[in-house]
């Protein structure tokens, strides 16, 4: 094997060893054994919430271990591929070298993707994520754009086998949605998706314009960590006003004959949360309270960050402006305005292929932290 290829394999081995140490492979195996033991308890399903968490945690732990073990196995096999390629080249064939080089390139890409996991070391990065999407300027096109974004994130979660729980969807009159709130139930979902927070811009020929004019639409994405009991977000009962109403679907049609939808208003802050996707008023109230707790936790974090920025004499960083542009006409390109990462296949991106954007965003964010 030539020195360049040997050097590449050695560098990948160093990176993967770091990943294995951060992931704690031995600890992960022990956790899987414990979760398997918990899952085999016949009384587990007496508590459905706990049972769902145990089975979800077990699935994600098994998937993470499998990813690391597969990468290690492929890396260990790579020198053998090159040895076989050298033998075949002596017999007059160079195809085997091309195949080995292709595997080296793919392995480099896959290990880099797994390496991003080691960069998720923030206080809440391990948490599940709450995602809020709101249509912005652009009328019916903006509402349609908000729904397209919702589908993009749900497709991303589905591709990774991450369960999604939709808490609330407020439909627009003509098409699309005014807003939506959903949870992605997976370890590190918040760490990954938090870089998606900001304003997303769509440029396309409007399907709602009878003159087929180009339209620019905006939608805002907010990503929050799911609150845990250790966060101590206590909300006095008197601080919350509870309103109930009937759930509605697309075009304002009623989808429930009872007042099962719930709107919570946090009186001290004015934060409003709605939930209508559960069948009962009680379930909707519980879900809405979880979202309200997450919003209050984020508010607390932002206040603490503002205080630190003031002490440092720093204006702070803003995530609220345009962070990504999706152009479908006159050319096709999705470009992140912070990282410069871009993809010329918007259809794939809108179908959930956003890992490249997430990885670039996480690296960009960590570099900003290092520079401060």
From Swiss-Prot:
One Gene Ontology CC term in the entry: cytoplasm
SUPFAM superfamilies registered for this protein in UniProt: Release factor
Keyword check for Cytoplasm: yes
Protein location: Cytoplasm
PTM description: Methylated by PrmC. Methylation increases the termination efficiency of RF2.
Residues modified to N5-methylglutamine: 253
One GO molecular-function entry: translation release factor activity, codon specific
InterPro entries: PCRF, Pep_chain_release_fac_I, Pep_chain_release_fac_I_sf, PrfB
Keywords: Cytoplasm, Methylation, Protein biosynthesis
Keyword check for Translocase: no
Major localization listed first in the record, in broad terms: cytoplasm
Family statement: Belongs to the prokaryotic/mitochondrial release factor family.
Functional description taken from the UniProt entry: Peptide chain release factor 2 directs the termination of translation in response to the peptide chain termination codons UGA and UAA.
Alphabetical list of HAMAP family matching this protein: Rel_fac_2
Name by which UniProt lists this protein: Peptide chain release factor 2
Primary gene name: prfB
């Amino acid at each position: 094997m030539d020195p360049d290829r040997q050097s590449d394999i050695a560098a990948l081995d160093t990176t993967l060893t770091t990943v294995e140490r951060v992931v704690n492979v031995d600890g992960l195996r022990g956790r899987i054994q414990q979760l398997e033991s918990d899952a085999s308890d016949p009384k587990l399903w007496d508590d459905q919430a706990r049972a769902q968490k145990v089975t979800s945690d077990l699935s994600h732990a098994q998937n993470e271990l499998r990813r690391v073990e597969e990468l290690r196995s492929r890396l260990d096999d790579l020198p053998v591929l090159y040895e076989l390629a050298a033998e075949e080249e002596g017999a007059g064939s160079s195809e085997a070298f091309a195949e080995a080089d292709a595997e080296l390139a793919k392995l480099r890409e896959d290990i880099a993707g797994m390496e991003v996991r080691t960069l998720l070391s923030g206080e809440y990065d391990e948490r599940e994520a709450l995602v809020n999407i709101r249509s912005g300027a652009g009328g019916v096109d903006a509402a349609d754009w908000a729904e397209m974004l919702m589908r993009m994130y749900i497709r991303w979660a589905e591709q990774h086998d991450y369960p999604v729980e939709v808490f609330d969807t407020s439909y627009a009159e003509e098409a699309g949605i005014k807003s939506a709130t959903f949870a992605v139930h997976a370890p590190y979902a918040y760490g990954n998706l938090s870089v998606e927070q900001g304003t997303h811009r769509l440029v396309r020929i409007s399907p709602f314009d009878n003159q087929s004019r180009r339209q620019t639409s905006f939608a805002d994405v907010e990503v929050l960590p799911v609150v845990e009991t250790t966060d101590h977000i206590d909300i006095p009962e008197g601080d919350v006003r509870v309103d109930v109403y009937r759930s509605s679907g697309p075009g304002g049609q009623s989808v429930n004959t009872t007042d099962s939808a719930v709107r919570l208003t946090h009186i001290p802050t004015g934060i409003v949360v709605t939930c209508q996707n559960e069948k009962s008023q009680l379930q909707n109230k519980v879900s809405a309270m979880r979202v309200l707790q997450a919003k209050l936790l984020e508010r607390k974090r932002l206040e603490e960050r503002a205080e630190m920025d003031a002490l440092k004499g720093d204006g702070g960083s803003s995530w609220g402006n345009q962070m990504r542009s999706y152009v479908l006409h006159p050319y096709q390109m999705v470009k992140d305005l912070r990282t410069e990462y871009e993809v010329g296949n918007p259809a794939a991106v809108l179908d959930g292929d956003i890992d490249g954007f997430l990885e670039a965003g996480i690296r960009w964010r960590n570099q900003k932290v290092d520079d401060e």
